[in-house]
């Protein structure tokens, strides 16, 4: 894929308002990641306003991380509001296969037609109805093992599906692309995966979902590579990562993106 940097340039020039319904652990990290990248986060999750706000925001992201009945109402109201307003929305099916409650919630949200689904291999397998071996929010399956399920899920749902791991896989059911950017320190910082969903959302606001998702993954992973060069461990990595997101230029992304057709 050519010119990933153009997607970064467009995202920053529009500074999209990203409505984030995420978990308690991720809120601060996700907001700072989006701000550093050039987007505008809004952590609006209550059912009293989430649906109305989804029509104001340029994009919605929903994370299943810490669901409760009231938050679930907010998720469903926001998804309905985004669809009604013609806004893209991104589903992050955290630990969707872990419990019956999460499986049911995942199925209901899937029926509300997300634009993009971003999860690890075990989450994508579970959401697609295949056998998965997830450990809570962590994956026990490989990205390669989930590629066929991701294609089926994309075909059946109409969403772009991104399976993230050491090498990411993105598909719209017809096309596939792999992203090799990233660093081993990234999974050592909590909520970076959740924050990646926000970045995918920011890139997908007003841009073609398949290409924007791939560009967002490359941007995020390349920032991880840059941060790792300066970091001594997970603590300093977290700070360096925000700086790398902020400092990256479109030309940097064009030079450093590791994308290839699958």
From Swiss-Prot:
Q: Where does ATP bind?
A: 118, 164
Q: Which NCBIfam families match?
A: PRK09355.1
What is the organism field in this record? Cereibacter sphaeroides (strain ATCC 17025 / ATH 2.4.3) (Rhodobacter sphaeroides)
The name this protein goes by in its record: Hydroxyethylthiazole kinase
Q: Check the record and name the InterPro entries matching this protein.
A: Hyethyz_kinase, Ribokinase-like
Query: Which family does the entry's similarity section mention?
Result: Belongs to the Thz kinase family.
Catalyzed reaction equations = 5-(2-hydroxyethyl)-4-methylthiazole + ATP = 4-methyl-5-(2-phosphooxyethyl)-thiazole + ADP + H(+)
Q: Does the keyword Repressor apply?
A: no
GO molecular-function term, one example from the UniProt record: hydroxyethylthiazole kinase activity
Note the Gene3D superfamilies from the entry.
3.40.1190.20
Identify the HAMAP family for this entry: Thz_kinase (MF_00228)
**CC cofactor:** Mg(2+)
Q: What is its EC number?
A: 2.7.1.50
Q: Which GO terms describe its biological process?
A: thiamine biosynthetic process; thiamine diphosphate biosynthetic process
Q: In which pathway does it act?
A: Cofactor biosynthesis; thiamine diphosphate biosynthesis; 4-methyl-5-(2-phosphoethyl)-thiazole from 5-(2-hydroxyethyl)-4-methylthiazole: step 1/1
| Keyword entries, A-Z | ATP-binding, Kinase, Magnesium, Metal-binding, Nucleotide-binding, Thiamine biosynthesis, Transferase
What's this protein's function? Catalyzes the phosphorylation of the hydroxyl group of 4-methyl-5-beta-hydroxyethylthiazole (THZ).
Residues bound to substrate are 43, 191
């Amino acid at each position: 894929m050519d010119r990933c940097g153009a997607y970064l340039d467009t995202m920053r020039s529009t500074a999209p308002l990203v409505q984030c319904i995420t978990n308690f652990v991720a809120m601060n990290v996700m907001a700072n990641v989006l701000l550093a990248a050039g987007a505008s986060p809004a952590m609006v999750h209550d059912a009293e306003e989430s649906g109305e706000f989804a029509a104001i925001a340029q994009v919605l992201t929903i994370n299943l991380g810490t669901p409760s009945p009231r938050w679930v109402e907010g998720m469903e109201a926001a998804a309905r509001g985004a669809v009604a307003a013609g806004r893209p929305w991104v589903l992050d099916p955290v630990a969707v296969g872990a419990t019956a409650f999460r499986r049911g919630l995942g199925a209901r949200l899937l029926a509300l037609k997300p634009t993009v689904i971003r999860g690890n291999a075990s989450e994508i397998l579970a959401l697609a109805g295949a056998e998965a071996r997830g450990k809570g929010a962590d994956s026990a399956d490989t990205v390669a093992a989930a590629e066929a399920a991701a294609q089926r899920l994309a075909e059946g749902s109409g969403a772009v599906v991104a399976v993230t791991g050491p090498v990411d896989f993105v598909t719209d059911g017809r096309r596939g692309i792999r992203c090799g950017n990233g660093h081993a320190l990234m999974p050592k910082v909590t909520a970076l995966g959740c924050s990646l969903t926000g970045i995918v959302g920011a890139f997908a606001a007003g841009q073609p979902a398949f290409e924007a998702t791939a560009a967002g993954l490359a941007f995020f992973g390349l920032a991880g590579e840059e941060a790792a060069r300066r970091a001594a461990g997970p603590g300093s990595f977290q700070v360096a990562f925000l700086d790398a997101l902020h400092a990256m230029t479109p030309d940097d992304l064009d030079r450093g993106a590791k994308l290839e057709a699958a």
